[in-house]
């Protein structure tokens, strides 16, 4: 925001890597910084304080397993450190791919930054107890990258959960 003078929402639009409009120098700089300094994503600043807090929290509130969901992929980095520190099993749930995401090639990455993304992705895939993918293609892709089991849980719903649904009475109903 300090570089652009824009609000958060405006800044996000301006540095959208897949926006095909010609980018200004500031936009290109923001995209370069985002891709090369904030690896794997801008939430990387959460990793250290989250791990510190959660280590203490888990001592007082034990759990059976750690589950991380990304993106943002930084959540997997938090979970990886917690799993290593606690010895707990870890489920890494990927809602989208990481380095094979369609916009990844638009991040203006230096060679070393691209390699760091790939190394972090590989560490997450290898160190998780199990990986969850959202689509068969992502599942197949991850299975070629790691020996860790990769399970498939697609987005959607189970029709059996809705077999008792009452038919609408002709009015538009909104429920929450």
What positions do the PLM features span?
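A short, active-site helix/loop in glycosyltransferases that binds the activated sugar's phosphate group
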Residues: 123-150, 159
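Carbohydrate-associated surface elements
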Residues: 137, 156, 168
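Short beta-strand->alpha-helix junction loop in the catalytic core
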Residues: 154-163
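Short N-terminal targeting/anchoring amphipathic segment
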Residues: 50, 54-75, 87-91
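Membrane-proximal helix-turn-helix segments that form the acceptor-binding/catalytic region
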Residues: 74-77, 81-85, 98-99, 111-130
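Conserved donor-binding/catalytic core segment of Leloir-type glycosyltransferases
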Residues: 168-176
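A conserved catalytic-core segment of Leloir-type glycosyltransferases
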Residues: 1-48
């Amino acid at each position: 925001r300090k570089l652009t003078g824009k609000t958060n929402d405006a800044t996000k639009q301006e540095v959208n890597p897949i926006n095909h409009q010609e980018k200004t120098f500031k936009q290109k700089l923001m995209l370069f910084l985002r891709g090369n300094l904030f690896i794997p994503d801008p939430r990387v600043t959460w990793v250290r304080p989250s791990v510190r807090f959660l280590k203490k929290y888990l001592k007082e509130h034990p759990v059976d397993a750690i589950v991380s969901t990304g993106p943002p992929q930084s959540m997997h980095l938090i979970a990886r450190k917690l799993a290593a520190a606690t010895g707990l099993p870890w489920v890494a749930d990927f809602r989208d791919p990481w380095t094979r995401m369609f916009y990844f090639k638009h991040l203006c990455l230096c060679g070393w930054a691209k390699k760091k993304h790939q190394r972090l992705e590989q560490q997450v895939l290898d160190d998780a107890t199990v990986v969850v993918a959202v689509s068969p293609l992502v599942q197949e892709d991850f299975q070629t990258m790691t020996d860790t089991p990769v399970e498939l849980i697609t987005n959607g719903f189970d029709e059996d959960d809705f077999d008792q649904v009452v038919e609408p009475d002709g009015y538009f109903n909104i429920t929450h």
